[in-house]
């Protein structure tokens, strides 16, 4: 029950809690949850009340920045993990922050594109975009910057669905499907694949589909159409 909730953690913050015994929430991750005021970087009580979870305010851990030291590896965690006791543990960051940082996004003219389960395009700017043109604003791990994200579930999750349900089993499945895809020329007429098997943030009724399948199309054509639909 709600009364038994001690802390509300993001995944990495829970792992850090188990490593250190210290309960903290990290700002970039929590800003992506919609629970923070992006201008103050603190929990927004109005939003919590709007969501009907105002009573959980006390379960939200104190906020820290990505580079803050949030504790040290405990003796118990050291025994279980092999890490050295006393090792400092930083706050960490939102996964898409980590993607942008590792791609050297450090100025507004830099763009990071992620082809994971989701298709994510992101950049940073000194102010959030507030006119509704983008999917999400969150705090960037570099103070004073916001991470601007446009994304949808239209990337490699589609390929994973195909491999899980339709592809022939293989010990090296990705090499096999890459060979199949390469066997079809870009000039060939492939079906059109709409990559909305997990719906779309553009239209709630959008669904995934193959359009234009003919009798001469092979599995290789289908796989290539998935690649092209994602791209």
At which residue positions do the language-model features occur?
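Active-site core segments that coordinate phosphate-bearing ligands/cofactors
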Residues: 1-24, 34-54, 69-231
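A conserved helix-loop-beta module that forms one wall/lid of the active-site cleft
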Residues: 52-65
């Amino acid at each position: 029950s709600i009364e038994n909730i001690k802390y509300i953690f993001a995944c990495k913050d829970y792992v850090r809690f188990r490593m250190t015994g210290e309960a903290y929430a990290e700002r970039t991750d929590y800003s992506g949850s919609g629970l923070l005021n992006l201008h103050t970087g603190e929990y927004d009580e109005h939003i919590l009340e709007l969501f009907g979870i105002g009573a959980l305010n006390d379960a939200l851990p104190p906020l820290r920045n990505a580079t803050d030291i949030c504790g040290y590896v405990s003796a118990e965690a050291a025994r279980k993990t092999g890490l050295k006791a006393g090792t400092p543990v930083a706050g960490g960051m939102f996964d898409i922050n980590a993607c942008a940082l590792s791609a050297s996004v450090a100025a507004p003219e830099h763009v990071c594109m992620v082809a994971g389960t989701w298709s994510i395009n992101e950049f940073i700017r000194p102010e959030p975009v507030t006119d509704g043109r983008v999917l999400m604003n969150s705090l960037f791990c570099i103070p004073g910057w916001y991470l601007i994200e446009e994304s949808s579930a239209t990337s490699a999750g589609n390929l994973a669905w195909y491999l899980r349900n339709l592809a022939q089993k293989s010990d090296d499945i990705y090499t096999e499907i890459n060979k199949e895809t390469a066997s079809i020329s870009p000039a060939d007429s492939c079906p059109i694949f709409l990559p909305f098997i997990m719906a779309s943030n553009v239209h709630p009724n959008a669904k995934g589909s193959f359009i234009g399948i003919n009798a001469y199309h092979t599995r290789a054509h289908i796989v290539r159409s998935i690649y092209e639909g994602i791209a």
